[in-house]
């Protein structure tokens, strides 16, 4: 796949194809970062540890930022999975704005650099419950920073134990929430491409009991159906 690296509006369809073409899905029993068990996950490491694809993802995020009209001082990747992406985005942002600051969030407490009195957009890879984002917000407040928004590369579109969506969790903390892709829609694409056998598709559907029956196995779904968006 030829990657479009020029600035402009976010190309949603291209981003979905990028995820599928780079084989980022991992199928099989796993424990997610949230602690939940699942029969699949999205593994962003291959895309974020190669400079060409890292640059593409960073520019995709900035295209979305441009569409949304956001003007933060800092982009910070939620540690540790998207730390490199946060840095890549900040470097591109500096080229556009002239801002010369860089802050990296440590895994537990503290930062490399000083985020105080700066507006922050947090970047996350795949969100499930939003727990890591809430912890980052609490840390930012302790350091007198101003978190304003969260952008996830992919949203699993599942509910927390309290029955809330990640959007509701983030917005309850006073931040805007945006995602570049919906995992159920990606799974529809993966199933259409023959990447998911039918027995596994049934298990995946069972993980999404809150969605309409047959959302994955149904034969009439268009590839990018925006099922839950």
Spell out what each predicted region is.
Residues 1-229:
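PRPP-associated nucleotide enzymes
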